[in-house]
Amino acid sequence: MLVGSQSFSPGGPNGIIRSQSFAGFSGLQERRSRCNSFIENSSALKKPQAKLKKMHNLGHKNNNPPKEPQPKRVEEVYRALKNGLDEYLEVHQTELDKLTAQLKDMKRNSRLGVLYDLDKQIKTIERYMRRLEFHISKVDELYEAYCIQRRLQDGASKMKQAFATSPASKAARESLTEINRSFKEYTENMCTIEVELENLLGEFSIKMKGLAGFARLCPGDQYEIFMKYGRQRWKLKGKIEVNGKQSWDGEETVFLPLIVGFISIKVTELKGLATHILVGSVTCETKELFAARPQVVAVDINDLGTIKLNLEITWYPFDVEDMTASSGAGNKAAALQRRMSMYSQGTPETPTFKDHSFFRWLHPSPDKPRRLSVLSALQDTFFAKLHRSRSFSDLPSLRPSPKAVLELYSNLPDDIFENGKAAEEKMPLSLSFSDLPNGDCALTSHSTGSPSNSTNPEITITPAEFNLSSLASQNEGMDDTSSASSRNSLGEGQEPKSHLKEEDPEEPRKPASAPSEACRRQSSGAGAEHLFLENDVAEALLQESEEASELKPVELDTSEGNITKQLVKRLTSAEVPMATDRLLSEGSVGGESEGCRSFLDGSLEDAFNGLLLALEPHKEQYKEFQDLNQEVMNLDDILKCKPAVSRSRSSSLSLTVESALESFDFLNTSDFDEEEDGDEVCNVGGGADSVFSDTETEKHSYRSVHPEARGHLSEALTEDTGVGTSVAGSPLPLTTGNESLDITIVRHLQYCTQLVQQIVFSSKTPFVARSLLEKLSRQIQVMEKLAAVSDENIGNISSVVEAIPEFHKKLSLLSFWTKCCSPVGVYHSPADRVMKQLEASFARTVNKEYPGLADPVFRTLVSQILDRAEPLLSSSLSSEVVTVFQYYSYFTSHGVSDLESYLSQLARQVSMVQTLQSLRDEKLLQTMSDLAPSNLLAQQEVLRTLALLLTREDNEVSEAVTLYLAAASKNQHFREKALLYYCEALTKTNLQLQKAACLALKILEATESIKMLVTLCQSDTEEIRNVASETLLSLGEDGRLAYEQLDKFPRDCVKVGGRHGTEVATAF
């Protein structure tokens, strides 16, 4: 957030200085509006300092690569670095133009010495610009190599998913081992390139300009500033002089930029030898520091913005003390050469990245039509190797064929990637996979099938010139019994469809609801042309055959467009009948409210990110935080490593096909001809940094130049079949393959985030934090169970006892839960469904003892299971869900084994609450005086009602409750329960409940809550601040002392409070 802006002109050739400022990480969810200007102590006395000390001399330069690559962060830093280098070039080009113009004007009437100096300056700038250009080329080269390794890693990852969904076999296991090895190699290459790129980031020169504050800086105050950036440190001390100036023992330092890492700044006020008061601590983003001109920034040290640290930061593209090439330059070149060899059969050419990518474009003869060569490459490498080895063990060594071979294939009469508008011939394609389950087969118009002796996975491509009689000869070997059974199956109650409608690319597929279709049997006298599928002929669907154990060949028509789209369409449509039969056993959610389904749209990623962000600053504070972080990371790893088993076998099969084909989409660089003049190489994307970009702008520009281009395979899959990812190479969404389990994980991640926020807020009140940590410990156990379920029985658990084995000991609770959840969603149940089941099972019993209280009792129970501060409203029930782990954990923690008896106890609570709410004035006063503390249940609903009665405007009601709470507080058991509940209420987000809890704590004289009240005094809501301050002042000498210290150093009191677990990065 921009909190201050000013101009700074140190002089020199840089001219006007651009200035920005930042606020760092904010502890509050919403910052208060602040003034844009502040009082600055412009003149700061500097103590004499020795030669500038470089941080990397202390061991910063560590060539050990990181364990995990950070591709998103690398992309951000690369963009910022490129912008900074381009800006440097622009600045120096402007300076060069100015000096050149001066030189021309001075040549006639100037002395030789002046001309010599000016010419010397021009040559210096030119040399520097050439060095900048070379530096940019090195950065581009590394980033291009990084992009390739990233794409290869994504491809290997998706191949792992494809193999995980296929039947297990020895060849598959060997292939999976090889792919894992390749995945590890690509990951190590990415980490190595990150280290090499980090060495090209230059250095940041940071100058201390002093502190500024609104009446916070007094003469004699001493401050210590500690800056941390990765392994680099800078500590300096300063003092505020009598004349308002400042003296610091350090003036300037140098930090080497890091790809991963932020600058952490901590300011401490030194009161004495052992007294140090933390003024503030912030963490700052560094991307915007890559600028050609020095920047003066103002850092907000505290949340109120009353203390600011002024720094002047200058970025230099080169390490001024290390003008020579890095010691690892030879290793880097060797590594790049090794990586380049994977994409070229011969000696790799030196890439320039400004004009073309790693891959050479093919140049067919002008009289031949432009064709894509990826199919030819696949035919010569992928298919051939697959046929020979029957496995994918050598996939990492796949690479495009030599140019001569590719041109041979590209000159075929028809290319299967064309739309077929001008094609007059059709190319029959026969594909067979024997390792697909269920013995699925496809019957063509002649019931073509693979020979009985063909048992290995095989993909064959038959060109148009191929003699069709060879195909007919294959049909003679097919078993007559199999043909007869196929014909009989077609005749039993199944009607053929005359035409399969084209699906809308934007409409999601619903394989479970589509009707079953049969293969249409053509007459045996049909000609050879019937081997091809026409638009008016029903598409052949995959059908289960008891006798067949392999997939019969599928004839595909090249005139219908992309082979991949046809293949996916056939495979997915063939699985429609099985999807209906498997729906119940797969465990996919059906028939639940829309509120439940809304959690499936990208919520798993959001829930993981929210919890990890809340844990990150505080995970070392408690052992429970560390355990939770470990379990959450373990669950996240399981979901990332597991294949995305979708809602049915149909989409799972589509994912397998798509993953295998799109993994290496980036290798599909079309071999289009040169431009019209034939002299230039086709440059797609228009820049060094756009070779592997998938942005919409580049996609449209690519297609506008080449309208016949089909784009990425994954994009075509999405448009024509409705399955697959929307952007090529994008990561698949996290999912367990079971919607009910997904919703359950999201709910518990969100609840853990809420608990972490409350624990951080109450960290200075041990008994409150201890109670909340107990709840968090139970959630850690839940996370462990969720990870086990997701890892071992992904999406296939149909019994609650399998998820929670201890459930069989509580049969009444288990019986009720099975009535609440649907057969296909055992992990959760909508809250309104739980309410309806409670009414159906227990409404008569509750109303018999407490007439008319059944509905509030049930809503109270559901609210307590969800750990809500107040009963749920009827309107919000439809959007809430109860998970089986919440249900079981609640009753276990309360020692409940019989639901009916527990509802009777809860009804007593609700009855007393309604009694207190309905009484007024004298009746309430009389009732409260008659109640003894031992007779009043110290339960959540009763305590909440008593506190809310204190907020009424009626003084007599408030007085009655005050007298009762004061008397009840003498009972130790009641006071402990009330104190814990009201302190926990302070951590809730309900403002009315926070206000009521403050008033109740005031009556209880709860000095134990002072630290939490001090935190609440910094609330954004004025009403809450006033009530908390009044309560604080009423708590005797300790409360008054805490309130007085609040004005002196608020950050020391609220450095944890007010931070609800989320921090926002703020750029310079």
Curated annotation (Swiss-Prot):
<comment type="function">
    <text>Acts as an inhibitor of the small GTPase RHOA and plays several roles in the regulation of myoblast and hair cell differentiation, lymphocyte T proliferation and neutrophil polarization. Inhibits chemokine-induced T lymphocyte responses, such as cell adhesion, polarization and migration. Involved also in the regulation of neutrophil polarization, chemotaxis and adhesion. Required for normal development of inner and outer hair cell stereocilia within the cochlea of the inner ear. Plays a role for maintaining the structural organization of the basal domain of stereocilia.</text>
</comment>
<dbReference type="GO" id="GO:0007517">
    <property type="term" value="P:muscle organ development"/>
</dbReference>
<keyword id="KW-1009">Hearing</keyword>
<dbReference type="GO" id="GO:0035024">
    <property type="term" value="P:negative regulation of Rho protein signal transduction"/>
</dbReference>
<dbReference type="GO" id="GO:0007155">
    <property type="term" value="P:cell adhesion"/>
</dbReference>
<dbReference type="GO" id="GO:0051726">
    <property type="term" value="P:regulation of cell cycle"/>
</dbReference>
<feature type="region of interest" description="Disordered">
    <location>
        <begin position="474"/>
        <end position="524"/>
    </location>
</feature>
<keyword id="KW-0472">Membrane</keyword>
<dbReference type="GO" id="GO:1990869">
    <property type="term" value="P:cellular response to chemokine"/>
</dbReference>
<feature type="coiled-coil region">
    <location>
        <begin position="768"/>
        <end position="793"/>
    </location>
</feature>
<dbReference type="GO" id="GO:0060171">
    <property type="term" value="C:stereocilium membrane"/>
</dbReference>
<dbReference type="GO" id="GO:0016324">
    <property type="term" value="C:apical plasma membrane"/>
</dbReference>
<dbReference type="GO" id="GO:0090023">
    <property type="term" value="P:positive regulation of neutrophil chemotaxis"/>
</dbReference>
<comment type="similarity">
    <text>Belongs to the RIPOR family.</text>
</comment>
<feature type="modified residue" description="Phosphoserine; in isoform 2">
    <location>
        <position position="523"/>
    </location>
</feature>
<dbReference type="GO" id="GO:1905872">
    <property type="term" value="P:negative regulation of protein localization to cell leading edge"/>
</dbReference>
<dbReference type="GO" id="GO:0005737">
    <property type="term" value="C:cytoplasm"/>
</dbReference>
<feature type="modified residue" description="Phosphoserine; in isoform 2">
    <location>
        <position position="21"/>
    </location>
</feature>
<dbReference type="GO" id="GO:0005856">
    <property type="term" value="C:cytoskeleton"/>
</dbReference>
<dbReference type="GO" id="GO:0045663">
    <property type="term" value="P:positive regulation of myoblast differentiation"/>
</dbReference>
<dbReference type="GO" id="GO:1903904">
    <property type="term" value="P:negative regulation of establishment of T cell polarity"/>
</dbReference>
<keyword id="KW-0597">Phosphoprotein</keyword>
<feature type="modified residue" description="Phosphoserine; in isoform 2">
    <location>
        <position position="341"/>
    </location>
</feature>
<feature type="region of interest" description="Disordered">
    <location>
        <begin position="45"/>
        <end position="73"/>
    </location>
</feature>
<dbReference type="GO" id="GO:0042130">
    <property type="term" value="P:negative regulation of T cell proliferation"/>
</dbReference>
<keyword id="KW-0734">Signal transduction inhibitor</keyword>
<keyword id="KW-0517">Myogenesis</keyword>
<dbReference type="GO" id="GO:0030154">
    <property type="term" value="P:cell differentiation"/>
</dbReference>
<comment type="subunit">
    <text>Homooligomer; homooligomerization is regulated by RHOC and leads to the formation of concatemers through the association of N- and C-termini. Interacts with 14-3-3 proteins; these interactions occur during myogenic cell differentiation. Interacts with HDAC6; this interaction occurs during early myogenic differentiation and prevents HDAC6 to deacetylate tubulin. Interacts with DYSF; this interaction occurs during early myogenic differentiation. Interacts with MYOF. Interacts with RHOC.</text>
</comment>
<keyword id="KW-0966">Cell projection</keyword>
<feature type="modified residue" description="Phosphoserine; in isoform 2">
    <location>
        <position position="585"/>
    </location>
</feature>
<dbReference type="GO" id="GO:2000391">
    <property type="term" value="P:positive regulation of neutrophil extravasation"/>
</dbReference>
<keyword id="KW-0221">Differentiation</keyword>
<feature type="modified residue" description="Phosphoserine; in isoform 2">
    <location>
        <position position="37"/>
    </location>
</feature>
<keyword id="KW-0217">Developmental protein</keyword>
<dbReference type="GO" id="GO:1901741">
    <property type="term" value="P:positive regulation of myoblast fusion"/>
</dbReference>
<dbReference type="GO" id="GO:2000114">
    <property type="term" value="P:regulation of establishment of cell polarity"/>
</dbReference>
<feature type="compositionally biased region" description="Basic and acidic residues">
    <location>
        <begin position="494"/>
        <end position="510"/>
    </location>
</feature>
<dbReference type="InterPro" id="IPR026136">
    <property type="entry name" value="RIPOR3"/>
</dbReference>
<dbReference type="GO" id="GO:0007605">
    <property type="term" value="P:sensory perception of sound"/>
</dbReference>
<dbReference type="InterPro" id="IPR016024">
    <property type="entry name" value="ARM-type_fold"/>
</dbReference>
<keyword id="KW-0225">Disease variant</keyword>
